[in-house]
Every structure is written in structure tokens, then in C-alpha cells.
Amino acid sequence: MEGFSLNQDRGSMQDALKQYKHGLGTFEQKMPLMGRKFNEFTEQCFAGNSLTEREKQLIALGIAINAQDEYCMIYHTKGCLDQGASEENILEAVSVAAAFGGGAAFSQGVTVVQQCIEEFGNTTH
């Protein structure tokens, strides 16, 4: 699996999402029990309860921004869009992440996250 680089062509966010899903699939093949248990755990964590799925995706995006995890930023920006979050909702989450994480978090939000919004629009993953 090739590494992801923001210097790739305009399709790089979709490519990165595919790379992540490919890596996850490879892990599940090699470690089926762990892969299945991880997926069950995260599916339950992101299921709507007292917080909606949209709110949980926005929280996860803020965490990914602060962790400087580009794959998770891409995945959860897409998840926010898929759950009906508006660009304003997403950018507000970026702002909260920046309030906590400073300039490093803000730079990720105004580059990686913005590129995801532009590339993915309202498609599903």
C-alpha cells in the first residue's frame, strides 16, 4: 500500500479514504477476530443514542484534527457530510479543535478538512 501525500492530484482525499479501507480490510483478513471486535466496538460507539451520529462524527473530527491524523480527518469529515453536517457545522468543529489545539489544529482544518468538503460534497462512503 502506497503512502498518502497531500501533494497528490485533486483525487487524493478519495485515494486516501480507499487506502485506509484497503488497510483495514487487510488487517481484518490477517486478524479476523480483532478486526471484527474493533468494528463492532466502533459501530456501537458511533451509533446514535443521547448524541446523534452527526454529533459523534463532529466530535471525532475534532479529535482527529488535534491528533494530527490525516486519515481520520478525511474519514470523519466524510462521515460528517454523510450524516448531514453542513460546511458551517464542520468549520465550527474545526474552530473548537483549533481553540484546543492551536495553530497546528487550525492549519489542518483549513487545508485537509476544507479539501475534503470540496471533494466529497454530499456523497456517501
Swiss-Prot record:
A GO term, aspect molecular function: oxidoreductase activity
Pfam families: CMD (PF02627)
Name of the protein described by the UniProt record: Uncharacterized protein YurZ
Disulfide bonds: none
InterPro entries: AhpD-like, CMD-like
